[in-house]
Amino acid sequence: MFKVYSDFSPSGDQPEAIKKLVEGLQKGYRIQTLLGVTGSGKTFTMAKVVEKVGKPTLIISPNKTLAAQLYSEFKSFFPENKVEFFVSYYDYYQPEAYIPTRDLYIEKNADINEVIEKMRISAIKSIMTRKDVIVVASVSAIYNCGDPKDFSDLNFVLSVGQEIDLEGFLTHLARIGYERKEEVALGGTFRVKGDVIEIYPRYQDEGIRIELFGDEIDSIYTFDPLNRKILEKLDRVVIYPTKEFITTEEKIQRAVKSILKELEEQLEYFKKQGKHLEAERLKQRTMNDIELLTALGYCSGIENYSRHFDGRNPGDPPYSLLDYFGDDYLVFIDESHITIPQLRAMYRGDFSRKKNLVDYGFRLPCAYDNRPLKFEEFWNKVKNVIFVSATPGDFEINNSQQVVEQIIRPTGLVDPEVEVRPTQNQIDDLVNEIAKIRKRNERALVTVLTKKTAEKLAEYLIEMGIKALYIHSELDTIERVEVLKKLRRGDVEVVVGVNLLREGLDLPEVSLVAILDSDTEGFLRSETTLIQIIGRVARNINGKVIMYADKITPAMKKAIDETNRRRKIQIEYNKKHGITPKTIIKPLDEEIFKQFMTDEDEEKEEIKTIFELKESLSIEEYIALLEEEMYKAASELRYEDAARLRDELFNIREKLKNKSF
């Protein structure tokens, strides 16, 4: 069913890793871990496992950038199969919120990327209609999605020779999300000219042309919407909904009754509490929504009523992408040391933001049920899971029935040497090391603890004649990727930053990583973080890591020992097989990143909303929220966000100490 196309055959540790993982699935192992070092070909191993197991596959990645990279690779591995992409479709996202002390209501504001929306619909359609499907997704996979039964029930089949009621047919098209437009042909529209109906689904590039003879379908074609060239003549075609959230007239009527019942209960609750302003606000807003739902079948924020449309009880898990797969499918959780903490944190963050909206009468309590899955709910839905990481966390290791190591790189590249040097004169020493790599036309990454240090160090390096830039949290994802593209091209020689792990892009030109303040204990210098940073130079034959420190912390020792263990295994393998390591330079695939760059904008808005809650919470509640969000950001390796929260926490505690509150 699946077939991998590649110029390479499995080598190094790959054949054994593939064999063990496949055998594990055949033995009924629910949870396995692929512990694969950077550059060992984990993606190729994943592809070969999919090929041998032959199940629909979901791959969850921690962000859009990495998801886009995986999507591109799997598309090239599986040209004959359906590889789909499912990530957040927002180009800009400001969540709905309310700040009580300022009486400030912030309306939801979002721009939807039509390309990604189309890819999401295509993914849903492929899962529902094919077995040979691979979906690469971000954590959007656990967010509220339409009911799979609606998507399935509302499609319809058209065949040549079939008699149709034209008016009823066009009404049904409108009902499943298509808009009638006679002039402009866009995805999700249709038009009628005489006996010809042209339909432009969002889930495919081709248009569908239906020619009638009286009430009978005479012919069906697919065509190119740009040049209108006929592509293929069909005997039958299935028309699928063009939106994720599609519902029926019966469901709308049922939902309205249920919403009115909840409204009545919540108004009674507010009146007992003496909250007459909140009651009046809620009544007015909800009745406006009901009026729109009754007249148009839609209202702004309709997703907040999804529980009523789905017929779910309060607290029941929402439908998500996982529900479209059925029972028998394979899940890879890529970069699991980041993705698992993300999956854990999504529900808590969503609930915190909505609490004020419900408490102050902007939303009914059913808004709580328009949410991502809780981690336990997600965990109950997945049956065959393979975690993939160079540094799997305790959860992955402790729950796996098998941990499969992939240490040997087919390229022969060895993990970099790690040196520990004193902090005295560290900047002068760093400049000397940068001078050496510049002569070889190679690049360097320097990781520091604060944004201020990054700025000052980058400025100093520029003064020394070095082409340097710093990456910081104010840069959006496109700008950050642009910096790394400049680094690869040689327009920049050194990048300085607090968090150089986020992108996860291949940087084979980088041969030096310098870690300043390596002996500062904390989330920025944990064992996992240090191993990940060391892996940044594992793709270059001259790879070298310098830790500037005056003592060796337990985290440093563990990271260095693990790196040396991996070096030894690779060196012995190279010697045995006569392999001479070479730096592998991959071309920079710029196109895959252009459409998918909004994760950080959403994270920034979330942090901003947290800071705004300062005025509506007690000091104790605000400190607790800051701590929770700081640890959440750190566990997801979003170190700049964690540092901003840490600084805010420090400022609050200083003010408390000085009694300036």
UniProtKB/Swiss-Prot annotation:
The segment(s) forming the UVR domain are: 620-655
Q: Which GO terms describe its cellular component?
A: cytoplasm; excinuclease repair complex
> What CDD domains does the record point to?
DEXHc_UvrB, SF2_C_UvrB
Q: Which GO terms describe its molecular function?
A: ATP binding; ATP hydrolysis activity; DNA binding; excinuclease ABC activity; helicase activity
What residues bind ATP, as annotated?
G36, V37, T38, G39, S40, G41, K42, T43
Q: Name one Pfam family in it.
A: ResIII
Query: Which intervals of the chain form a coiled coil?
Result: none
Q: Which UniProt keywords apply?
A: ATP-binding, Cytoplasm, DNA damage, DNA excision, DNA repair, Excision nuclease, Helicase, Hydrolase, Nucleotide-binding, SOS response
- Write out the residue ranges of the motif Beta-hairpin: 89-112
Q: How does it assemble?
A: Forms a heterotetramer with UvrA during the search for lesions. Interacts with UvrC in an incision complex.
Family, similarity comment: Belongs to the UvrB family.
What is said about the domains?
A: The beta-hairpin motif is involved in DNA binding.
How is this protein named in the record? UvrABC system protein B
Q: What is the lineage of its organism?
A: Bacteria, Thermotogati, Thermotogota, Thermotogae, Thermotogales
